[in-house]
Regions:
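Conserved hydrophobic packing residues within short motifs/helices of P-loop NTPase cores
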Residues: 36, 66-68, 94, 119
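Structural microenvironment flanking redox-active thiols in thiol-disulfide oxidoreductases
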Residues: 48-88, 98-108, 142
Length: 153
């Protein structure tokens, strides 16, 4: 199992609005594991990963899932919203566009250089898993089950 090169490193905190205008403050999401999925509407492997994230979300009700749609071009929010609706992404969704940013994006804060990238953060905000691509669903699911089950023991 490949864990993050930042294993036990603290996750950068962010406080932003989701696509519905609700405030999302990572520091206030306490006591639960958090799965962050960095994706883009322009990224076919990202779109292929969405059903896998959805399955993880459905199978792990105590897991907080945050999908962060990251784009470099503006005017992609309508397409992002369409994908979120079509794929039934009924968890926290954040949209960020480089051209509209006045401060570093969450992707920049997390040193994301390829999409999709998936990060698992434990209850004390330490990064315990990081993976690039969409082909390690079984590994990710195993890590989540092991971590979340040990939390509930």
């Amino acid at each position: 199992i490949s864990y993050s090169p930042y294993k036990n490193g603290m996750a950068p905190l962010f406080n932003v609005k989701d696509i519905n205008g609700k405030n999302i403050d990572l520091a206030k999401l306490r006591g639960k594991y958090i799965l962050i999925d960095f994706w883009g509407s322009w990224c076919n492997p990202c779109i292929a990963m969405i059903p896998k994230i959805k399955k993880i979300h459905e199978e792990n009700p105590d897991l907080i899932v945050i999908s962060i749609a990251h784009d470099q071009e503006d005017n992609t929010l309508p397409e992002t919203r369409k994908i979120i609706a079509e794929k039934g992404m009924d968890w926290i969704n954040i949209y960020q566009c480089d051209r509209e940013m006045t401060k570093p994006s969450i992707a920049t804060m997390y040193n994301i250089y390829a999409f999709p990238t998936t990060i698992l953060i434990e209850t004390q905000k330490k990064i315990i898993y990081r993976d690039i691509g969409n082909n390690k669903y079984n590994e990710l699911n195993t890590v989540i089950r092991n971590q979340c089950n040990s939390q509930n023991d």
